[in-house]
């Protein structure tokens, strides 16, 4: 079957989904979560095949981490589906309701987008997360994962499709593209009369490819070059906690810290404590001359280091004379993803928040909270640094649009 035929089937199934009640969608998502539990052994076995093949190819640590499913991670995926199931249904929400002077009633109502294409690599959890969010919002979803996760994605999709069938919903509402040729992906991205939105998740190369070749709208973020600025008034212990969690808890995540900026007035107190905590987590440090004056044992940082998304246990450090210099650095090297300030000065916190255009800005909180689940959205479908209808971590509302519904009693304009 051609990719266009698959997309047309998904569009027809999306029409069925759009008519389901909130209760029916909740029951469906709970059944999908249960299907993952039922098929857990097969899913983990399939994932192990993918991981083994990736290791044989010499895949890097960051990609391997994203690819790997453990029993705990798979359980967390099911838990995320259950969280999405009980979230308020955005479809049908009325966001405006007023009566015009001529008596017509004007409402703005949330409706599904239609068909969403997810293009991703080495992230089998996205198969379930994306399906759950799209279906909850009444959309069909076309999933095109990477070849490195094909066995994992297929096992997850089969479990979820079984739940759809048993609920009387066409399984085409969740369509997994098994033809992984690049030409097929290109054809999918050209289907502007069928596909309403494409969301790429993966490496910068994949995301740029999708953005450059798609004829459908694309919501994306290229990379996550996230910063922590430690202000002169920062609590040292607090800032160290933010740094270690942001850098070392899961360095392959796009919300992990890549660069540390330290105010010169606190550098001699903060940097030794930070270095000791990071060395305990095997983090490689690279710094500018002012940083190396305090930490002479670390390597010199290059200009490329400050622009890098390491996705690894590597951190670039720079000492700055003031907040304005820190903000200028972030504007030059940042990716509009997530930025953090550690400070006890409210005015500096407010300046930091108001001066940056990043999708998420944090004060005295870890960058790792830049996640749909942590921000109360349920499982996220992606993070947008595209200033369109959604900005930042994207949950259910980002998968709907508002339309006008007008009710009258025969009013005419002229």
Curated annotation (Swiss-Prot):
Keywords: Amino-acid biosynthesis, Cytoplasm, NADP, Oxidoreductase, Proline biosynthesis. Belongs to the gamma-glutamyl phosphate reductase family. Catalyzes the NADPH-dependent reduction of L-glutamate 5-phosphate into L-glutamate 5-semialdehyde and phosphate. The product spontaneously undergoes cyclization to form 1-pyrroline-5-carboxylate. It is found in: Cytoplasm. Its EC number is 1.2.1.41. One of its GO terms (cellular component) is cytoplasm. This is Gamma-glutamyl phosphate reductase. It comes from Xanthomonas campestris pv. campestris (strain 8004).
